């Protein structure tokens, strides 16, 4: 994997693509002050280096009837690799789990889940507790989503340490 040094133009490209991944290359090039070919090459280089990992459509969960968002805090007495592999495999197979984090502090794992309603959530919850031996599972329901973004603060990139071939 090639090493990439991010400069101010790369950061402008990343900012623009995070806002609209379908932006035409001509428009992107104009926004960042490049001609089309050098802009396209930079986007390609950022993709090949793993800085841009994928381009996706962001779908409104409400439009799909997924009106309930819950955060599930999991505690376990099991902290061995075999247990984690089993638990991670089971959670990864659950399409309603959008995020899955190993945590520090009192909670061992935190999951963000979407569901149609409480009955649907309960079926997801029951599926989760069957995966592995869990000590404590508590659910917290979102009353209102105040901020939702996938846009990373590229302005902070100068403070990042090298990752995946990027410095």
Model-derived regions: residue spans:
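A compositional/biophysical signature of low hydrophobicity enriched in polar/charged and small residues
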Residues: 1-167
